[in-house]
């Protein structure tokens, strides 16, 4: 039984080999049965154990000789299975492989060798061990193995083993290299005939296959039209973007080409001969060669060119004749037809060869004379068709036909007629023969002309058809003659009048008759049109050049003369400079600018003739621009480039600029180049719209304002009104925009002019003191604006100029410069005048720290000027009493009238002041309001208000400021001093924008309340301060103490002291409002600068109130008047600047000066400073420091000296007189309705000054905290501009100023001012609105 098993096994062994391919199916069930799976390593161990098993079996098999070997494997398998099963591995495939490769060999040794890494180099397939991983079967799948695949894997595993053998390594390396070589050959190996096929394709059309619609390909310029046929490029080709082409004679290249072809082809002859070729084909080729041999010999003699092959390809494109190319196409077409008809491949080959041979011969026949055309036609054929070896030619023809099968000749022929690359390349020599022939061979449908064309246009198109037929055989080069261009241009001009659709149809129709495609035709037509336009430009250009050349000699002569004069002047200057250097003169700096001047300018002087010629030229050029299809440039850029490149060179170098040409010809091209966006739109100043509100203000304040300076209140008021020079009538609505005069800011008026204007104003005020009272109330609305203007003027005024003025003038200048502290004149008159000026200026400067000088309304400036002039007149002509009263009246009228009047009354007319005090109390002086506004410290009390109260108008003003001030300053300041310093109170808020509010509020209250005493207003906010002054004109009693100018002065100092000690208790100081007022002013400035709101601001408030009172210590500071009172004030003021408070708040300085100017300017300034010091701890110094502390020192020139303080003080005083002044408005946030009119200042505040505005003058309370730094340097400029603005604003009159204060501002301005004014009105509300 063993035998059969053996046999079965033997017979199955091969099957096993096959089965091994599907071991999974046979033994998969068994494999799954074995639960565990062993990984390769575990399996390797059993495999290693297997070898002993065979060894054991081997001896057993030895007992059985023949069948032993075969059963051995069985036993091996069986024995091997148990271990594998034990190890749960599938080694069954392994046993079959060993028997298969070497069934009859001894398995043990091979297995040992395998396990031992096969030390012997015997056959690699002796034994194979496979590691199989079994997985549990599932219902859907079971493990499957493919024996052949496993065997291959095993062989791969063995390869590294064999690599150990050096011999095997060599063999393997050789095999690897061979494989790599084959791989690269397959990948990169080239086909030898590929190049020739490309050349054959190039023969037909080098450009074939390119996308003609690709914008990158430019076929608009044909090389053959530009380069003669006798020339070719030096190296036989085109190199894009590599420079200029270099040419040489084409005959050489042609001969070289033929010789090259021959030279290259003889070596091929033997190779071809080796091949078997039919005799007929050979004979045909030989015949063709014989015909061409003579030519070949000649080139050989000449020599062979290395670049021949390349040149031949390029020449094909350049020198192809239309006839030869058409013949070639005909030939290829016939060949293609023959190939289609004949199914036998040989027949087409024969036909093709014969046809291929014929064209060369035909070409030769055509060119027996060896003309260029023949050479070019034959030359391209030579490399393919002409050869000494027929067989080679046959192969070439065969390849060519294969390639031609890929060509759509119908499409090529159509393209030829359409001006396709074929036609373009074929007709590059200028031939139209090709398109004509193509149309004959393959008739093409010509697009019909659109209907409805003009008769003339159709006629010209017909002319073009006829001309095209005449030129058909001459090529494109000769096609576009002058006549043809004229026809085309005429057609183009007529087409320009038609629509784009019709134009396109006509172009499509014309395309069939011209040797170019539609796109090229359109480009050519446009180019012709532009050329004609350029021709039209030549004549006008020539005329212009002629005209310029005629005019230039004279201008050049003048220029040379100027140069000579300049040189002479330079020489003279040089000599003088040397002398000055020797003398050590200081004028060298002045001469330096002259030295920098290079020379006279080359400025061309236009005349009408040249301008007309230029315009004509530009008109023609604009016509060209309109013809541009794609306007890549704007008309402006187009013209400018034309002028730069074409027109400008007509002038000598340096004599003309393109921008001048553009400007001179603007009349012609303005419709195209005047885009609104390019124009610089300079917004016009806003119209003055505030007349109504000023009028209302005027009405209310008119009654309440008591003429301070006038003998009687009514007289003062009237005087003020008249002094205002019809300020009430003149009360134009002052727009914030208009209020700031740009020119004034940039060109500040001279101090002298300002002082003169102020003097005039003062003189005017003298007459109508009583009337001024009413005028001032009327001007209430304007006080803000006027004050702003005054502040502007103050900023422009030089700091020290007031000192230079006479005592009277000094008083005025001081008042103008009130913002800058300065000594106040001692004389009551001087004090009064000074007070007026200072009141006007100081109030406004203090009030509007943020307001630029420019913002002040022109009317305010005028009023300021009038007041200053009046003040001058009064101070110079009147005694202390009369001049003071007049000045006060004038000041009152301008600054609300009351302020100035108060200043004067304390000095000379204490009784008058008392009389007016009732009115003034009701009336809030703009200056006072301004000061309060500038004062950021709400603590400042209304002590100054009592001072104002000294003069009835002033007292009223003080009251209002007090009221406003009280709200603003009530929280910060003590209530005690508020009563007396209602103005100061207000000033304190004014630091927080209370000044503006005060001024406005006072003005508005005066106007609205019928001049309820400012104290009454102040009383409501801060009744405790000075209820009487605020509520009623009773503060007049305070002025009464100053009934006599001297007592008034003394009272003023006392009042100032009181203010310093207490702002509130100064209701009585109100009795000497002048002195209190100056103190208030000083305090106010200092308060703006410092944090002490109560004491300093009270005095600041007073000043602001007393701004109407022109008695401003600032005057003393400014002019340093000799008057004892003024001197006292200046000294204190000086202290203030020295402390640096002046620098921080010129307002403080101003405030002091203003009080001094008023009743008893000197005393008041002293008191003022005392008040300030009381607030700060030391007179003026204290006041100044507080100002600097609380705010960015409202005055930029805080560091400026007493002189600066004096100036600012004078300015403040003047501003105070001009109630409209609202310089401090910006800081103010109007809290009270009354203050709202003063809010105008706020509106002004936004205005920026061209120059640094000394903040000390403006007294920017809260807002200007950081401004202090600029005070010193800017004070002079500020005074200047401020004076100018002040004069402007004040000229209209106090009434106008008052009206300005109340005048409603533009909405945005009003809002700003309202915010500022409210803050001013309520000391507690420091610029809350803002």
UniProtKB/Swiss-Prot annotation:
Residues 93-111, 1030-1044 have a biased composition (Pro residues). It holds the Pfam family UBN_AB. One of its GO terms (cellular component) is nucleus. The modification Phosphoserine is found at residues 13, 251, 312, 417, 420, 423, 585, 1107. PANTHER family: CAPZ-INTERACTING PROTEIN AND RELATED PROTEINS (PTHR21669), UBINUCLEIN-2 (PTHR21669:SF10). The modification Phosphothreonine is found at residues 244, 253. It comes from the Eukaryota. InterPro entries: HRD, UBN_middle_dom. Transmembrane segments: none annotated. There is a cross-link at residue 273 (Glycyl lysine isopeptide (Lys-Gly) (interchain with G-Cter in SUMO2)). It comes from Bos taurus. Residues 16-37, 67-79, 123-133, 575-585, 688-699, 1321-1330 have a biased composition (Basic and acidic residues). GO terms for biological process: chromatin organization. This is Ubinuclein-2. Belongs to the ubinuclein family. The modification N6-acetyllysine is found at residues 1052, 1132. Residues 345-356, 807-816, 896-913, 938-956, 1082-1148, 1158-1169, 1308-1317 have a biased composition (Polar residues). Keywords: Acetylation, Isopeptide bond, Phosphoprotein, Ubl conjugation. Residues 1-133, 249-304, 336-356, 574-597, 672-730, 802-833, 864-913, 938-988, 1017-1201, 1308-1330 are annotated as: Disordered. Residues 701-730, 864-895, 1017-1029, 1045-1054, 1061-1079 have a biased composition (Low complexity).
């Amino acid at each position: 039984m063993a035998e059969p098993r053996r046999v079965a096994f033997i017979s199955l062994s091969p099957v096993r080999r096959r089965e091994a391919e599907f071991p999974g199916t046979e033994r998969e069930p068994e494999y799954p049965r074995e639960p565990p799976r062993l990984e390769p390593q575990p399996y390797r161990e059993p495999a290693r154990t297997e070898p002993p098993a065979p060894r054991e079996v081997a001896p057993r098999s030895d007992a059985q000789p023949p069948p032993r070997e075969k059963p051995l494997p069985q036993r091996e398998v069986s024995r091997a299975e148990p271990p594998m099963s034990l190890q749960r591995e599938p080694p069954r495939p392994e046993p079959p492989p060993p028997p298969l490769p070497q069934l009859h060999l001894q398995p043990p040794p091979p297995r040992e060798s395998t396990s031992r890494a096969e030390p012997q180099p015997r056959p690699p397939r002796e034994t194979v061990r496979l590691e199989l991983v079994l997985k549990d079967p599932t219902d859907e799948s079971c493990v499957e193995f493919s024996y052949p695949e496993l065997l291959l894997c095993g062989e791969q595993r063995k390869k590294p083993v064999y690599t150990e053998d050096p011999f095997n390594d060599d063999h393997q390396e050789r095999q690897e290299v061979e494989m790599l070589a084959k791989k690269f050959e397959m990948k990169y190996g080239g086909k030898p005939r590929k190049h020739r096929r490309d050349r054959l394709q190039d023969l037909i059309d080098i450009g074939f296959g390119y996308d003609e619609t690709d914008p990158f390909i430019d076929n608009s310029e044909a090389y053959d039209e530009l380069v003669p046929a006798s020339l070719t490029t030096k190296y036989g080709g085109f190199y894009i973007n590599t420079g200029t082409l270099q040419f040489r004679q084409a005959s050489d290249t042609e001969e070289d080409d033929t010789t090259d072809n021959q030279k290259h082809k003889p070596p091929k002859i033997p190779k071809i001969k080796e091949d078997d070729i039919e005799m007929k084909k050979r004979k045909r080729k030989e015949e063709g060669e014989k015909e061409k041999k003579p030519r070949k010999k000649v080139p050989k003699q000449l020599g062979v060119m290395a670049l021949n092959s390349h040149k031949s390809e390029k020449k094909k494109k350049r020198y192809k004749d239309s006839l030869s190319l058409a013949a070639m196409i005909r030939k290829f077409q016939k060949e293609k037809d023959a190939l289609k008809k004949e199914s036998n491949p040989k027949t087409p080959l024969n036909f093709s060869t014969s046809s291929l041979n014929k064209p060369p011969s035909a070409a030769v026949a055509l060119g027996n004379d060896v003309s260029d055309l023949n050479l070019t036609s034959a030359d391209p054929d030579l490399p393919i068709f002409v050869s000494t070896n027929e067989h080679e030619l046959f192969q070439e023809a065969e390849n060519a036909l294969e390639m031609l099968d890929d060509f759509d000749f119908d499409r090529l022929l159509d393209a030829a007629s359409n001006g396709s690359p074929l036609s373009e390349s074929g007709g590059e020599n200028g031939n139209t023969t090709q398109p004509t022939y193509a149309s004959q061979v393959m008739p093409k449908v010509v697009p019909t002309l659109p209907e409805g064309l003009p008769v003339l246009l159709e006629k010209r198109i017909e002319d073009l058809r006829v001309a095209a037929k005449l030129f058909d055989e001459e090529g494109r080069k000769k096609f576009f003659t002058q006549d043809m261009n004229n026809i085309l241009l005429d057609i183009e001009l007529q087409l320009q009048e038609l629509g784009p659709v019709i134009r396109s149809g006509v172009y499509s129709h014309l395309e069939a008759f011209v040797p170019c495609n539609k796109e090229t035709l359109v480009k050519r037509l446009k180019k012709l049109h532009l050329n004609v336009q350029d021709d039209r430009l030549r004549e006008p250009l020539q005329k212009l050049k002629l005209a310029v050349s005629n005019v230039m000699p004279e201008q050049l002569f003048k220029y040379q003369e100027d140069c000579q004069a300049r040189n002479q002047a330079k020489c003279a200057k040089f000599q003088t400079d040397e002398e000055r250097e020797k003398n050590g003169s200081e004028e060298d700096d002045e001469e330096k600018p002259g030295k920098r001047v290079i020379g006279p300018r080359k400025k061309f002087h236009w005349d009408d003739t040249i301008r007309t010629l230029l315009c004509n030229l530009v008109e023609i050029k604009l016509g060209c621009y309109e013809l541009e299809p794609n306007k890549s440039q704007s008309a402006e850029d187009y013209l400018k480039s034309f002028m730069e490149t074409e027109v400008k060179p007509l002038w000598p170098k340096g004599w003309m600029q393109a921008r001048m040409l553009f400007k001179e010809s603007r009349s012609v091209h303005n419709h195209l180049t005047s885009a609104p966006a390019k124009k610089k739109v300079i917004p016009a100043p806003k119209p003055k719209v505030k007349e109504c509100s000023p009028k209302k203000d005027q009405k209310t304040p008119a009654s309440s304002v008591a003429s301070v300076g006038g003998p009687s209140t009514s007289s003062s008021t009237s005087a003020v009104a008249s002094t205002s020079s019809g300020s009430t009538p003149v009360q134009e609505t002052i727009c914030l925009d208009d209020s700031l005069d740009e020119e004034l800011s940039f060109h500040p008026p001279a101090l002298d002019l300002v002082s003169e204007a102020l003097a005039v104003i003062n003189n005017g005020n003298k007459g109508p003191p009583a009337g001024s009272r009413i005028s001032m109330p009327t001007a209430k609305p304007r006080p803000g604006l006027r004050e702003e203007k005054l502040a502007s003027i103050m900023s422009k005024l030089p700091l020290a100029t007031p000192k230079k003025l006479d005592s009277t003038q000094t008083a005025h200048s001081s008042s103008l410069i009130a913002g800058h502290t300065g000594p106040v004149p001692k004389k009551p008159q001087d004090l009064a005048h000074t007070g007026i000026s200072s009141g006007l200026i100081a109030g406004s400067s203090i009030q509007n720290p943020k307001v630029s000088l420019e913002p002040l309304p022109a009317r305010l400036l005028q009023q300021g000027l009038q007041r200053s002039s009046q003040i001058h007149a009064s101070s110079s002509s009147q005694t202390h009493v009369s001049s003071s009263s007049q000045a006060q009246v004038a000041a009152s009228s301008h600054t609300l009238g009351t302020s100035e009047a108060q200043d004067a009354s304390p000095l000379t007319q204490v009784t008058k002041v008392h009389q007016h005090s009732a009115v003034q109390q009701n009336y809030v002086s703009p200056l006072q309001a301004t000061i309060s506004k500038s004062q950021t410290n709400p603590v400042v009390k209304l002590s100054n208000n009592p001072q104002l109260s000294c003069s009835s108008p002033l007292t009223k003003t003080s009251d209002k400021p007090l009221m406003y001030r009280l709200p603003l300053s009530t929280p910060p300041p003590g209530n005690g001093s508020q009563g007396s310093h209602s103005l100061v109170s207000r000033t304190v808020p004014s630091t927080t924008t209370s000044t503006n509010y005060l001024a406005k509020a006072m003005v508005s209250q005066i106007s609205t309340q019928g001049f309820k005493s400012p104290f009454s207003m102040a009383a409501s906010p801060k009744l405790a301060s000075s209820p009487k002054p605020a509520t009623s004109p009773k503060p007049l009693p305070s002025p009464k103490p100053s009934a006599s100018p001297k007592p008034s002065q003394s009272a003023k100092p006392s009042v100032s002291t009181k203010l310093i000690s207490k702002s509130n208790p100064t209701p009585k100081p109100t009795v000497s409002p002048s002195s209190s007022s100056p103190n208030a002013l000083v305090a106010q400035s200092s308060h703006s600068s410092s944090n002490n709101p109560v004491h300093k601001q009270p005095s600041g408030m007073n000043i602001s109130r007393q701004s109407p009172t022109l008695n401003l210590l600032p005057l003393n500071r400014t002019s340093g008047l000799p008057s004892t009172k003024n001197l006292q004030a200046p000294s204190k003021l000086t202290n203030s600047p020295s402390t640096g408070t002046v620098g921080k708040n010129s307002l403080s300085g101003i405030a002091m000066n203003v009080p001094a100017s008023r009743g008893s300017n000197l005393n008041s300034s002293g008191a003022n400073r005392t008040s300030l010091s009381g607030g700060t701890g030391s007179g003026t110094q204290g006041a100044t420091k507080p100002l600097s502390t609380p705010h960015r020192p409202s005055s930029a020139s805080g560091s400026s000296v007493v002189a600066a303080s004096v100036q600012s003080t004078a300015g403040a005083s003047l501003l105070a007189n001009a109630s409209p002044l609202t310089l401090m408005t910006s800081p103010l946030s109007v809290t009270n309705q009354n203050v709202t009119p003063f809010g105008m200042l706020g509106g002004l505040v936004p205005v920026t000054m061209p120059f640094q505005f000394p903040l000390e003058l403006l007294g920017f309370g809260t807002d200007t905290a950081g401004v202090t730094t600029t005070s010193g340097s800017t004070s002079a400029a500020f005074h200047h501009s401020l004076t100018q603005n002040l004069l402007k604003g004040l000229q209209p009159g106090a009434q106008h100023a008052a009206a300005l204060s109340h005048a409603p501002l533009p909405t945005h301005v009003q809002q700003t001012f309202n915010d500022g004014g409210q803050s001013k009105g309520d000391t507690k509300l420091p610029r809350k609105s803002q």
